[in-house]
Structure formats: C-alpha cells, structure tokens
Amino acid sequence: MKILAIGNSFSQDATRYLQEVSASAGEPLFVRNLYIGGCSLEMHANNIKSNEPAYQYQIDAVGVQKISIPEALKLEDWDYITVQQVSGRSGKPETYEPYMAFIIQTIRDACPKAEILLHRTWAYEIGSGHGNFPAYNRSQLEMYGAIVAATNEYAAKYKLRIIPVGDFIQLLRNTPPFDFKSGGMTLCRDNFHLSLDYGRYAAALCWFKFFTGRSAMDVTFVPENTYFSCTNAIKKAADLYL
C-alpha cells in the first residue's frame, strides 16, 4: 500500500512514525510526505502550475530529495494521496477554493487509480501564541469545530473520506494523561505542532487504523523515551474511538 501526503509540517507530524508503526504490526505501509513548512492549498496549486521542485520528498520526516508535485505523482503507483489545508486556514472554508478543485483534478488526471483523502488536522493548544489563533478567538474548541465544519464541507463536495487526526487529538485532550487544561501533558511541542513523542504517535496510530483496520494493540513500536502507560492509553483510545 503506497501513500503520498501533499502537505506541510502537519503531515510531517502525522507520518513520522507511520512506517514504523505499521511494520511493527506486520502490515508495512509505504509512506512519503511532500513537505514545505506552512504550505497552503493556494501555494500547492501555484507550485503545481510552476512545476517548481520546491518540496522535500520525505521518508519518516527526513527529506531525501527535492521534487515537484507533478514529479512526485509519477514517481510511484500511489494507492492513496492525501491533501490538507495549512493549519491557520484549516477552519476557514473560504480559503479552500479555487485551489482544492485544481489540486484534486491534477491528482485525478495523473493518478486515476489513487483514492484522494482529506487529512483533518488538529486545533492549536490552549493558550497558543500562533499568529493565526486570533482568527478563532484563541479558542481551541472554536478552532476544532471550524476545522470539522470546513473539512466536512469539502469532503462532501468532492466525495472524499477524512483521516480524523484532529478528532483523535481533541478526544485525547479530554482524557488522562493528556488533559492539559487540568495539568496533564500537552500533545503539542510548541502549542501547535504535535509533540515528538505522544502527539506524533497518536497521529500515526490514527492513520494506521484508517488504512489497515487493524487493532492498535497489534502495534509493538513505541517512540523512544516514552512511558508504557501513556502509549498504551493512546492505543486503547484508538481502538475504542477510531
């Protein structure tokens, strides 16, 4: 199974552990990420038009070459290709078009057998100083709700399935030990990107379950310097809610 993410640092977060997670469960996934930090749908569309080799072609969050989107689409026989809006605009549906239509048509023309998926990303951490947080009144719940509404709208419009990472992260934020508002650990490393341990692990498990349908308990891989109680809590939540 070959998966290409057309994204930014948030798809980098989500795919960092996905190959290791899936391989440890005996169902290895081939995963690549097209990375430009802070890349919006508008920028992706412009880069397609220019055929600019502006992207890091990443394996496990490490760039191995520079590439354009048209080149990447032809590089493998992709089974799935994911798209997403940049985080600050992810809950602003008016920012998706006309770029979403152009990107989807480009993918369908180049990879007619691939299923296009929409990656629902997460809201910023409570108290985040991100410059786009005021657009959501600095409210995590308002931002999360806006992301859900926008992604639902475009998933319905283009008949896309959603990878619900944003839902899973929000759910974990209301469970111990990740209830940050009550003194628990944050799932973010800088109040918006996912933490390098539990946040990225949770996202990888979400993608793993989406693509394989397998139990998270089949996964034996865990990131370094993590506590069993925490990784096990994420696995249990994944099986219960995803």
Report each predicted region and the residues it spans:
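Conserved SGNH/GDSL esterase-like catalytic core that processes O-acyl groups on lipids
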Residues: 2-4, 10-97
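A structural signal for well-ordered alpha-helical scaffolds and beta->alpha junctions
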Residues: 11, 15, 100, 144-148, ...
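Alpha-helix termini
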Residues: 20-21, 172, 216, 226
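Alpha-helical cap/lid subdomain in secreted, periplasmic
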Residues: 67-196, 209, 218
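Conserved catalytic region of serine esterases and O-acyltransferases that act on ester linkages
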Residues: 184-187, 191-242
